[in-house]
Structure formats: structure tokens, C-alpha cells
Amino acid sequence: MFKYFVKSQDCQADMTTFIIDDHTHTQCLYYVPLVFSSTETANHVAFKAHLSQAVISPGENQRIVYDDVQLNLGGGYHAHLGGFVAPINGTYLFSVAVCSIGNHYIVLYLVKNDVMIGRVLAGDTVYNDCSSETTISELTAGDEVFVQHHSTVGDLIHVNENILNSFTGALLQAI
């Protein structure tokens, strides 16, 4: 177990004596544990996934599958489905970033169990454009969150080595 000692502002705490360079010092210190309990460490849930290739002419309500998984703590993100399934009840943060090239646009929904919880639009008549959406949602274990193309609006999600379209999420607080 790691320990961390902090100088106390009030000297009601235990007095601690230590020696530095052959001089004896007495200070008022208190102990703050820095180690999570086993139940807290089991609640580390986070993921980050990118698109490995462009999505051209996605269909109506097509799920966007972020197949290049960079991080998957807790195993909640399923690349073959393109969705995150909550392993535990909690408050989660989700973010989706999308880019489109000039004269193209795309509208994506962030969806929880078939209900939209966020929306992002990227596109311009001339310039490349990127946009993102971040939201917080309370999930019950087994709830699914994914990114879906909106209806028939938009036609291209652009990908190259400088543009990372991503879907990320993290557990903020277990409940």
C-alpha cells in the first residue's frame, strides 16, 4: 500500500519526528491513503476507438463501427458491434468526433438503447470540417451506447492519417 503524508494546518494531528541532514525535525502530519480498494479498481471503465477507413454513403440509421480500438478498460466496447455495453451501473461520459471533407457533410447521433442522447454535424460547402459532441448519461449495466448515421442526411465520414474520427467513453462514477 502506498502512503502519502501531508503537512497538517492544525497540529491536532499526530506529531511525527524525522531526521534530515543530521537535524531532528518534528512536524504535525496526517496520513492520506492513495490506494483504491479492490471494488474501486474493478470499476475502471474507459474506451477509445477510431475509424480505420472512410465511411462512404452510410445508409439510413446505419450504425458507425469504430473498429480501431485504442483503449478498452473494463471490456465494455465491442468493436464488432461498434457499441459500448455498460458493465456496471454508473454515470458515464461519451464523446464522438467526426470529420468531413469540403462539399460533403454528415450528421451522427449518439444513441443509448435506441434513444438519441447527442448529435453532431460536420460539413461545409467548401472546406473540410470537424466537429464533436460530448455528453453525460446515467447507464444501467447492460445498456448500450453507439453512434448512428442520422436518417439519409450526409454522405461521407472522411479519414486520413491526420484526421481521427473517434468514439470515446468513460465511467465517471459507479452507482
Where are these regions (language model features)?
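Extracellular jelly-roll beta-sandwich "head" domains, especially the C-terminal globular C1q domain
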Residues: M1-I175
